[in-house]
């Protein structure tokens, strides 16, 4: 399916429901593109994916959506000026419907691999007609009905009522029969005009059969039994052996999609017919062109699947069927379909075989003259399309990188609000129930006095990298890190009723992770952290312009910080509010140890508790509760890490210089000692590294 139809569906959704709904439809359907190139082929099922996704998002019935989208098709075509072709397709509405197949043939110049539907009319009267619609695609009936209603109003100011008569499925085709009820004022006007002609003048206009077959060199005359009675002089030169044979065994009917029978042809005489020889035209040993026929019933579908190169081996004719009452036969008046002169030469045809009175000679010569120009233009257009696709891919990649940076600075839900044009003030929100965790490293200042600045950076980098991995799976969000302080919240920006439980699970894992870190250069013997937790209400929002940050405001932040300051090494100190919240939601989940009250401010005290242990399995947060700083909606290659590092150049970045300096000195470096542990040793030291020490807290949290 070409992008013209897909782009029409996308345009309708955007104009009817808005960009936000279109974004939801893309997400539900798994589509990533915003625009669709008109002449590019897409998956056959993509249109149905978009329609069903729109149904899921908006709740509108699928049939109603298809009808409304079809109704907007004529307006959509005005962007590409295809509406100008529709205006001249027929003088009346029935003529327009009969000319739709011809329109699709015209569109093959723009869409060479087009698989169009077929339309033909019968039982026309003053009150309407019966329309047959055949297509290899299913599910577009309401789409076509919407097109018919809209075009009848736009071009012919006629109201049409569509009555569905029958639906059949045969040979991978969907055959729909509809009765179109409308006021057909032009019915029989043309026949009346012909009957008013002077009969005496018509009697004087006579023509012999020899002249007739000379004027139409590729005519085929066959009787009711489908046997070929005579052929034109041009066809006689290349297919002399077909006279007396059945036309439906000598040729295959490509268009329209009907059975190759006398009755069917009589019903569809207003349609363009395309025939293709059932066997290829070949040359004998003497170089004389001969035609071989067999009685093998070859499927027409095989010809439809053939490529242009394979079809050139067969003779294709396109024309119209006329019933000759005097001969009691049907005349097929057509011309060969030749894409270029070499094909005509291989078929044994020459320019003088074509009629003088029509433009067939001019078309063949003009096609050759324009072939080089068209090929050049097509090559240039193809190159432009490739460049556009490459630019679009680069744009998408840069957009993903920008999103990745944004999601590292702000929560994904808040960042998406800002991207959609909302102000920073509009992103501010009050959260009545959140739980905040503060941690810091015990005697961090004393540690820094024995380490170089680069060692301090590497030390914090390893610790916080492991902490970041923990929070991604615990339904919490890292607000900020200042020095050795690490602040985490649960319940904002994504609300959850298990915020206290998620925070305590995360804090417990922090202690276990810190206890597994040792140092081998005798500067740091062990790493202890302390943690403080408090629950309450906060106001959250984005602060700053040049460097926007997601910040929390309120007394809850202050109290949580006080909990951390009054905690003990490798301990989690929680406030009475958090303690009560855990006990109310899930009694006995955690074992607590009561501690003395601590002063908060202005002689205000609060009861505190140490977390001793946990009982039962950990609760797994839902994906929507995990506000990661990474955008995991897109998968990218490793080279996307260039987003956070300077481009490769002759000058080294400060980060790479610092890492090299550490390697040369052979000082502090951290590597995992187990699935979650850290081992520190000197890479350049000749001493064998000691076994890592288990520095889990003495009263471990299980």
Curated annotation (Swiss-Prot):
Protein's name in the database: Soluble guanylate cyclase gcy-31
Enzyme Commission number: 4.6.1.2
Residues covered by region (Disordered): 614-702
Entry function: Synthesizes cyclic GMP (cGMP) from GTP. May play a role in embryogenesis.
Subcellular compartments: Cytoplasm
Binding site for heme: 104
Regions annotated as coiled coil: 368-406
Residues binding Mg(2+): 440, 484
Known catalytic reactions: GTP = 3',5'-cyclic GMP + diphosphate
Pfam families: Guanylate_cyc, HNOB, HNOBA
Binding note for cofactor: Binds 1 or 2 heme groups per heterodimer.
UniProt record similarity statement: Belongs to the adenylyl cyclase class-4/guanylyl cyclase family.
Keyword Ribosomal protein part of the UniProt annotation: no
Keyword hit for Transmembrane: no
């Amino acid at each position: 399916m070409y992008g013209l139809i897909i782009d029409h569906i996308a345009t309708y959704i955007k104009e009817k429901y808005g960009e936000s709904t279109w974004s939801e439809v893309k997400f539900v359907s798994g589509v990533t593109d915003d625009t669709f190139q008109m002449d590019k082929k897409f998956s056959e099922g993509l249109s149905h994916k978009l329609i069903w996704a729109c149904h899921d998002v908006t709740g509108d019935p699928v049939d109603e959506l298809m009808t409304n989208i079809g109704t907007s098709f004529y307006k959509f075509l005005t962007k590409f000026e295809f509406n100008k072709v529709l205006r001249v397709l027929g003088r009346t509405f029935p003529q327009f419907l009969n000319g739709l197949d011809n329109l699709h043939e015209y569109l093959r110049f723009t869409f060479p691999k087009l698989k169009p539907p077929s339309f033909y009319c019968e039982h026309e009267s003053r009150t309407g007609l019966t329309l047959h619609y055949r297509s290899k695609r299913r599910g577009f009936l309401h789409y076509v009905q919407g097109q018919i209603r809209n075009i009848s109003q736009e071009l012919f100011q006629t109201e049409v009522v569509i009555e569905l008569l029958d639906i059949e499925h045969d040979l991978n085709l969907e055959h729909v029969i509809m009765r179109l009820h409308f006021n057909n004022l032009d019915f029989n006007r043309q026949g009346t005009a012909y009957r008013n002609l002077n009969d005496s003048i018509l009697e004087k206009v006579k023509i012999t059969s020899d002249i007739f077959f000379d004027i139409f060199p590729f005519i085929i005359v066959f009787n009711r039994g489908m046997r070929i009675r005579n052929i034109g002089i041009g066809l006689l030169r290349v297919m002399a052996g077909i006279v007396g044979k059945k036309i439906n065994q000598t040729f295959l009917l490509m268009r329209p999609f009907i059975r190759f029978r006398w009755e069917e042809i009589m019903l569809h005489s207003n349609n363009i017919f395309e025939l293709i020889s059932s066997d290829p035209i070949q040359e004998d040993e003497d170089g004389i062109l001969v035609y071989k026929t067999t009685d093998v019933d070859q499927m027409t579908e095989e010809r439809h699947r053939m490529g242009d190169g394979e079809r050139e081996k067969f003779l294709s004719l396109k024309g119209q069927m006329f019933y000759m009452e005097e001969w009691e036969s049907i005349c097929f008046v057509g011309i060969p379909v030749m894409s270029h002169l070499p094909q005509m030469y291989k078929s044994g045809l020459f320019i003088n075989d074509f009629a003088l009175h029509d433009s067939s000679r001019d078309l063949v010569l003009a096609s050759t003259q324009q072939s080089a120009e068209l090929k050049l233009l097509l090559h240039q257009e193809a190159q432009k399309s490739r460049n556009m696709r490459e630019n679009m891919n680069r744009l998408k990649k840069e957009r993903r990188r920008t999103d990745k940076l944004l999601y590292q600075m702000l929560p994904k839900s808040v960042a998406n609000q800002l991207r959609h044009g909302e102000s920073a003030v509009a992103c501010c929100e009050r959260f009545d129930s959140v739980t905040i965790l503060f941690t810091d490293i015990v005697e961090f200042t004393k540690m820094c006095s024995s380490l170089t600045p680069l060692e301090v950076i590497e030390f914090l980098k390893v610790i916080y990298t492991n902490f970041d991995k923990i929070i991604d799976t615990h339904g919490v969000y890292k607000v900020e890190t200042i020095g050795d302080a690490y602040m985490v919240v649960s319940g904002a920006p994504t609300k959850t009723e298990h915020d206290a439980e998620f925070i305590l699970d995360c804090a417990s894992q922090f202690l276990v992770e810190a206890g597994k870190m040792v140092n081998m250069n005798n500067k740091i013997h062990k790493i202890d952290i302390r943690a403080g937790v408090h629950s309450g209400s906060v106001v959250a929002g984005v602060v700053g312009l040049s460097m926007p940050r997601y910040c929390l405001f309120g007394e809850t932040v202050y109290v949580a910080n006080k909990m951390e300051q009054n905690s003990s090494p490798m301990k989690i100190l929680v406030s009475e509010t958090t303690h009560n919240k855990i006990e109310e939601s899930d009694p006995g989940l955690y074992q607590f140890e009561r501690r003395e009250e601590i002063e908060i401010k202005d002689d205000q005290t609060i009861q505190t508790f140490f977390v001793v242990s946990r009982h039962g399995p950990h609760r797994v947060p839902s994906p929507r509760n995990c506000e990661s700083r990474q955008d995991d909606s897109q998968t990218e290659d490793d080279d996307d890490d260039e987003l956070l590092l300077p481009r490769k150049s002759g000058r080294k970045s400060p980060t790479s210089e610092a890492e090299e300096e550490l390697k040369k000195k052979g000082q502090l470096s951290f590597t995992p000692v187990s699935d979650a542990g850290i081992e520190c040793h000197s890479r350049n030291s000749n001493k064998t590294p000691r076994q890592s020490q288990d520095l889990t807290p003495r009263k471990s949290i299980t």
